[in-house]
């Protein structure tokens, strides 16, 4: 019992899977979680990694938070050939059920996420028998439908190859997942992940995310879209392509635009390497509280050529939207 007479909340497990390139960023994510959680004293953080143990322990010692447990695994997955947006560390996600064999349930987060909502509310979501829960990846559907419109069927065909139905609009982003670890162990998730990777290696687009969606087909619960809002989706670039988003997902986009419970800094531009990231200042708020020394990137200077390019992209996007909507009217 707490000294104020209120019962202590059930322990809450939050997990990260990183390499040394993203280890420092975990401190910022953790600080955002602690600052916005109604029961911060109940959180147990785990960092699953394949790095030198002394290096990780030394890094964690600098952080302004406690209750962080490093767990080392052997990551013998090969490099992700040709997939610059996917690191080898992404495969550590597949090892979580076995690496954390003493846990029944966990929230998994990528290290380029900040939590603005109460993690306790996410933790207490009823999975209703599902083995995992995540947020539909709106960006994937925008890019897939745009690709189909332009004659590029790779994203659609990748889903079909894995036994997924692109029409169901249930493909989730693997950067934030609520996991029933008992169910994942029971289904042999880690070994089946490895087998699927061996079968399709070099043929997948989002690799670990593709495999997770394939293995959890029919066992994945969809969460409120505000739990995983992508910075790239809110950027000027992708905003000009919203017309490709299926009508049934537009309500999810509206929710994300109105409120964010978690911001996921997707894409190559991150708050720590670019001053032109949507809601980047929110990340910096928690960076300043993390105990880490973060140098801010300098503001980019726009050239005339960039302004012209941006203007042309805007015109081209408007024309694209007009043609796409006209095609929908004719086909309807």
Residue ranges and their predicted role:
Residues 55-99:
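Active-site-proximal specificity loops/subdomain of glycosyltransferases
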Residues 43-51, 134-136:
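Short internal beta-strands
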Residues 74, 89-150, 178-179, 185-186:
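GT-A fold catalytic core of metal-dependent nucleotide-sugar glycosyltransferases
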Residues 153-168:
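Short, flexible, basic/aromatic active-site loop/helix in glycosyltransferases
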Residues 32-41:
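Short, acidic, metal-binding catalytic loop of nucleotide-sugar glycosyltransferases
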Residues 51-58, 142-143:
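Short, charged/polar "capping" segments at the starts of alpha-helices
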Residues 1-12, 18, 174, 179-332:
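A glycosyltransferase accessory/donor-loop signature
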Residues 18-24:
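Active-site beta-to-alpha loop of glycosyltransferases that engages the nucleotide-sugar donor
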């Amino acid at each position: 019992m707490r000294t104020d007479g209120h019962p202590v909340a059930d322990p809450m497990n939050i997990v990260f899977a990183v390499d040394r390139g993203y280890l420092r960023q975990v401190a910022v994510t953790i600080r955002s979680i602690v600052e916005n959680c109604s029961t911060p004293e109940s959180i147990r953080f785990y960092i699953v990694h394949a790095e030198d143990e002394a290096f990780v322990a030394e890094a964690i010692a600098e952080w302004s938070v406690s209750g962080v447990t490093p767990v080392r695994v052997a990551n013998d997955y090969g490099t992700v050939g040709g997939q610059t947006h996917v690191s080898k560390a992404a495969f550590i996600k597949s090892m979580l059920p076995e690496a954390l064999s003493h846990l029944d349930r966990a929230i998994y987060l990528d290290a380029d996420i900040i939590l603005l909502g109460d993690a306790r509310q996410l933790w207490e979501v009823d999975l209703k028998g599902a083995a995992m829960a995540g947020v539909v990846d709106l960006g994937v559907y925008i890019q897939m439908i745009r690709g189909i419109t332009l004659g590029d069927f790779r994203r659609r065909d990748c889903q079909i190859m894995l036994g997924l139905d692109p029409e169901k609009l249930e493909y989730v982003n693997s950067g934030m997942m609520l996991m029933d670890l008992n169910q994942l162990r029971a289904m042999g998730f880690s070994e089946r992940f490895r087998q699927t990777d061996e079968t399709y290696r070099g043929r997948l687009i989002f690799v670990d995310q593709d495999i997770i969606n394939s293995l959890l087909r029919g066992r994945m619960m969809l969460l409120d879209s505000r739990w995983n809002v992508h910075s790239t989706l809110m950027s000027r670039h992708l905003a000009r392509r919203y017309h490709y988003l299926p009508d049934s997902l537009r309500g999810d986009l509206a929710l994300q635009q109105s409120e964010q419970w978690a911001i996921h800094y997707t894409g190559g531009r991150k708050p720590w390497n670019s001053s032109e990231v949507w809601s980047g200042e929110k990340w910096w708020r928690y960076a300043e509280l993390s105990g880490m020394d973060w140098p801010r990137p300098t503001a980019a200077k726009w050239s005339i050529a960039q302004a012209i390019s941006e203007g042309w992209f805007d015109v081209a996007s408007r024309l694209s939207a007009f043609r796409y909507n006209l095609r929908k009217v004719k086909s309807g």
